Amino acid sequence: HIAKFIMYATTVMNIIGITCLMFGFKFEWYWIKFTVYENRFTGCYVNPNLLGFISVVSIFCCHILSKGHFMRRIAEKIPEPGISKIWIVACLATNAFSLILCDSNASLVLALGYAIVYIVYMFFADKAGLSPSKIILKITALFLVGVFLTGSALMFRTICQEGFSVVVSKTTSVVDLLLGKTESELVQEGLTPEQREQLENDKITFSHENKNIDSGRKKLWLESINLFKLSPIIGISNGNIVLYSAEYSNGALEYSYHKSDLHNGFLTILVSTGVIGFVLFGIFGFRFAKHSAQHLFLQKKTYRDDVYPCLFAFLFAYLIFACFEKALLYDISFMVVWFWLIMGYMSCYITKFEPTLESQYLFHGKRLRRVTRTML
């Protein structure tokens, strides 16, 4: 039901946002700029990065809802009408288009990571007849596929942004004519250089105004090194990041939109909780990742037509995404809630469908043997 709601809601919101964009409808409510913010498409959301993340989540939900075995199992428990393929196609198209126009690099990394990890599973799902030579061949093929997908995605995004920029300029010109603007206001002949420069600045190109590919993250990450040195063992606490930055680093992080996060989930944990907290979080994450990967790749059956590979691929891709965004722990947002929700679904899936008792202990083999001896 959550996946269906996300699919329907995001499709409708994207259609509304793209329609408003084409006809030049923009407005500002308090500090929030809708449809376009800093030359990037926001649609009905508060910022482009949130739009990009929700677009990837919607594509992920569409992928889940297209799994036949999963949908048949759900239908057996909750009889209800099926999902029209028109909705799935519309959701995929509008969200992919919104992901391109919002120009969110981190969200594009999330989408590519999800696709590549899922392809890795598809390559190695069938373990019959695997040999060292075949494994090397598949790894080489996967590397080439990853390079091709990354290059194609970047090129396709640039082409779509430039093409739709022209479309938007044409449609807004038509709207201006219909609203009664004079020809002299629409044609650039006779305009001063300052007016022409203003027109160029107002033109929507759907690309970052800040041309640095890191979008200022490098400055945050370098600054975090100084904060980490203040208390490397137990950390400085998440709530002190901005305060300590103002006191010890000339206020380099004293910006309202940075809050107390370093745009890197792992780095934020390291600075906030020190080496001790980071190691504890790493142990928890490693044990869960090991268990989920073993459940996926070392089972006799495959999950080609089930949702477990989708959950695994999204969670793995999110860990890469967390290197560039406010994620994992301290930022209470839709992104963080969705990450822990997917992890919870994976845990329930493993506990329910793995036949061994050991799954409940996350490979505590020694503990399992002690429990068995005690019972005997």
Model-inferred region functions:
Residues 3-31, 44-128, 291, 316:
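Alpha-helical transmembrane segments of multi-pass inner-membrane proteins
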Residues 21, 122-208, 222-230, 238:
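A membrane-periplasm/extracellular boundary helix in multi-pass inner-membrane enzymes
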Residues 30-46, 259-261:
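Active-site-proximal inter-transmembrane loops
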Residues 42-58, 239, 262-265, 270-274, ...:
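Membrane-interface micro-motifs in multi-pass membrane enzymes
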Residues 60, 111, 115-119, 284, ...:
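Transmembrane alpha-helices of multi-pass inner-membrane enzymes
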Residues 71-84, 295-305, 357-376:
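Membrane-interfacial, low-structure loops and terminal tails that flank and connect transmembrane helices
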Residues 124-125, 248-251, 273-316:
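Hydrophobic transmembrane alpha-helices and their immediate junctions
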